[in-house]
């Protein structure tokens, strides 16, 4: 991977209804309903709003068999009104629900942390190598019949790992670590490869964007080692609403998109689902502007570790560098020096002259040839 020059990671193509994912396809945008899945009419209407806003997949929670079976009615309701957007069933805890959902949805999301392994009790478990291998066989015994149902119905799957729902088995062996999240996913991917099931999308999510970014990067590295190129679904869990939710999603998803990673994204907001689509669209459109940019002859520092980056050591100058937090510099060359009280910059760059009326809590930067050392809280910019 070239960290200075953008190029999208090559991934395999996955068929999801009439909207394929990965390969040479565009980065897809999706959302998730927050309606009761047994309420067919409400689900259909909300799905339509998501689709009309630009959503290319619609995910619905399927807590039980009844909800999974009702996906058939929701699908019929949408198709009868001219919508052919694929539906995705979101399944937790019960493999039987996934078996049913695979017959009516174009894609089924399962969580490795609770698909076969029992619910978390936060106990430390000890395994011999043989016992650990037996636990993997239990996963195979339950997962392969599900894959066969998916093959029969041309249903894709997403193996979706969540930071907060790793099994006791994985937690005991790896701890609450990115490595544990990656291995939780890889266990299922190896079974898919062995069974020649290729319509697989993967995701690893966390509410902590630093953990999310590091773990997805690590997952891609591990897949490359084993010759896998499954497409990636990106998202930040519990991002929130308003500006905070949008900023948090942009940080996590945007950092990975900038790496060239990601084939579909969902911006998760605590708002109406259709509000997520424009935010996702902006992220994708921004990253597309980087395609074909002029070559940047950058070179990584010898000590830089892409999978576990650390802050470069610097000398502190005033409140910049060293152990200080990064500062925010605003540019005000057009002469407007008003600031939002909630979002004040640390410094304002004002070009060749400083304003007569200044905020004492903000430092000012001026061009070096216009700097007067007698001016308080004003510093030269060379």
Describe these PLM feature segments.
Residues 7, 23-42, 61-63, 85-94, ...:
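Active-site mouth loops of central-metabolism enzymes
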Residues 84-123, 129-149, 154:
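Hydrophobic or amphipathic alpha-helical targeting/insertion segments
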Residues 62-104, 335-338, 357, 374:
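N-terminal active-site wall of soluble small-molecule enzyme domains
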Residues 1-31, 147-153, 289-337, 376:
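N-terminal amphipathic alpha-helix/helix-capping segment at the start of soluble metabolic enzymes
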Residues 65-89, 138-154, 219-228, 289, ...:
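Alpha-helix-loop-beta-strand connector modules within alpha/beta enzyme cores
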Residues 34, 54-78, 112-134, 200-209, ...:
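Glycine-rich, proline-tolerant flexible connector loops at the mouths of alpha/beta enzymes
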Residues 126-143, 148, 170-321:
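Catalytic alpha/beta core domains of metabolic enzymes, predominantly
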Residues 27-33, 56-60, 85-91, 108-110, ...:
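Hydrophobic faces of well-ordered beta-strands that scaffold small-molecule active sites
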């Amino acid at each position: 991977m070239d960290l200075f020059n953008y190029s999208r990671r090559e991934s395999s193509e996955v068929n999801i209804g009439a909207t394929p994912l990965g390969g040479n396809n565009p980065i897809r945008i999706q959302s998730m309903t927050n309606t009761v899945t047994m309420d067919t009419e409400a689900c259909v209407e909300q799905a339509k709003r998501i689709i009309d806003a630009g959503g290319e997949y619609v995910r619905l929670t399927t807590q039980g068999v009844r909800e999974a079976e009702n996906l058939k009615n929701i699908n019929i309701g949408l198709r009868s009104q001219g919508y052919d957007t694929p539906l995705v069933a979101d399944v937790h805890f019960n493999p039987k629900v996934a078996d049913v959902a695979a017959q009516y949805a174009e894609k089924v999301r399962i969580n490795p942390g609770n698909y076969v392994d029992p619910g978390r009790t936060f106990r430390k478990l000890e395994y011999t190598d043989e016992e650990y291998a037996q636990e993997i066989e239990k996963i195979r015994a339950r997962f392969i019949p599900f894959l066969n149902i998916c093959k029969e119905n041309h249903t894709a799957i997403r193996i979706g790992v969540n930071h907060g729902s790793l099994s006791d088995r994985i937690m005991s062996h790896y701890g609450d670590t990115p490595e544990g999240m990656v291995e939780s996913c890889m266990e299922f991917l190896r079974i898919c490869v062995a069974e020649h099931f290729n319509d697989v999308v993967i995701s690893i999510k966390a509410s902590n964007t630093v953990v999310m970014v590091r773990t997805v990067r690590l997952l891609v590295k591990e897949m490359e080692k084993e010759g896998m190129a499954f497409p990636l679904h990106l998202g930040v869990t519990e991002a929130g609403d308003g500006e905070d939710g949008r900023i948090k999603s942009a940080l996590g998803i945007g950092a990975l998109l900038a790496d060239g990673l990601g084939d579909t994204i969902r911006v998760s907001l605590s708002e109406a689902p259709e509000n997520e689509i424009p935010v996702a669209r902006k992220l994708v459109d921004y990253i597309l502007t980087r395609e074909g940019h002029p070559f940047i002859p950058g070179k990584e520092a010898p000590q830089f570790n892409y999978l576990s980056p650390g802050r470069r050591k610097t000398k502190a100058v005033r409140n910049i560098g060293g152990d200080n937090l990064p500062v925010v510099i605003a540019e005000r060359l057009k002469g407007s020096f008003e600031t939002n009280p909630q979002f004040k910059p640390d410094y304002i760059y004002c070009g060749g002259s400083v304003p007569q009326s200044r905020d004492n809590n903000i430092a000012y930067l001026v061009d070096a040839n216009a700097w007067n050392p007698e001016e308080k809280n004003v510093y030269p910019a060379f």
